[in-house]
Amino acid sequence: MPERDPILLTPGPLTTSRMTRDAMLRDWGSWDAAFNRLTKSVCADLVRIAGGGDAYVCVPLQGSGTFAVEATLGTLVPRDARVLVPNNGAYCARIAAILRRLGVAHVELPFAEDEPASAHAIDAALARDARLTHVALVHLETSAGLLNPLDDIAAVCRARGKALIVDAMSSFGALPIALAASGIDALISASGKCLEGVPGMGFAIVRRSALEAAEGRSPSVALDLHDQYAYMQRTSQWRFTPPTHVLAALRAALDQFFDEGGQPARGARYARNCATLVDGMRALGFEPFLDARAQASVIVTFYAPADPAYAFPAFYAAVRDAGYVLYPGKLTTADTFRVGCIGALGADEMRGAVAAIGGALESLGIAMR
């Protein structure tokens, strides 16, 4: 008997629907008109979800979400710019690492791993250093599941006349975002997150005027968003071999996204998943790392058991044997693990995950205190 696919309680890759997986059973010619129409429809819908209107365009890119983050920073940020990076986790630090590699001056504004970035502190940092030209913000820091206040920070950037680039990798599709009148220059996400597609394609939704001003700026050929967009405008094609099956799966996932009711319905389902998970885990004795006011309903970080019998590899394996895949912790200040609430899942799967975790505690002899 074939093994049942595990349920992925991770922030991407994640459990996808049968319809999304079935969409990958067809082969596509990368220069074919039908595939070009598929690309165009996906890009139009991504701008629509972001509330961008005619002022924004979508540029898809082969690879993981980090490819799209690096491409966006390398394309939109001039080499003589100076970027403020609010930092409360590993994905904020990754932005700083990319800027360092690009040779772009940047200033990290540190926050604790359980502390949302403060719009007031960002405003003060911009006031102190007139050389700062951009802010690069992670909307949802997946290290802990921490939500940063995008609207408040965008308002500060508008008032200060600073360009804002947003990594919305783990929030786009689940949380409300409206680009029109936001002042955001670019929003970056990927196929395999809250849109419930499969991994393999990132994308940037960019203010048209900012992209058009970036010709020739990227130090990379493959990661040049301006060149990618200009080529697509001329030919309707990708510059290099596209992830055809990934795009087809994303088209199917977007159809299901709209059928479900779009972002409000998707976000509400994830919120129910999160509440079911947290309530069940608390009943087992686990406590979330974050205060509820800072917690996004996409992934929850829990403190690891204090019992010496606990070791994450064995705990992970026991839960995996029960059919659920957890995610290791990524914090520097506490021993934790993470449980995702996204994907083609509902409250029943969350209850099943809690039962599997409870079973792992019992089988491994781990006491909760």
From Swiss-Prot:
SUPFAM superfamilies: PLP-dependent transferases. Belongs to the class-V pyridoxal-phosphate-dependent aminotransferase family. PhnW subfamily. Involved in phosphonate degradation. One of its GO terms (biological process) is organic phosphonate catabolic process. Its EC number is 2.6.1.37. HAMAP family: PhnW_aminotrans_5. Its cofactor is pyridoxal 5'-phosphate. Gene3D superfamilies: Aspartate Aminotransferase, domain 1 (3.90.1150.10), Type I PLP-dependent aspartate aminotransferase-like (Major domain) (3.40.640.10). GO terms for molecular function: 2-aminoethylphosphonate-pyruvate transaminase activity. InterPro entries: Aminotrans_V_dom, NH2EtPonate_pyrv_transaminase, PyrdxlP-dep_Trfase, PyrdxlP-dep_Trfase_major, PyrdxlP-dep_Trfase_small, SP_NH2Trfase/AEP_transaminase. Pfam families: Aminotran_5. This is 2-aminoethylphosphonate--pyruvate transaminase. The modification N6-(pyridoxal phosphate)lysine is found at residue 193. It catalyses: (2-aminoethyl)phosphonate + pyruvate = phosphonoacetaldehyde + L-alanine. Homodimer. Keywords: Aminotransferase, Pyridoxal phosphate, Pyruvate, Transferase.
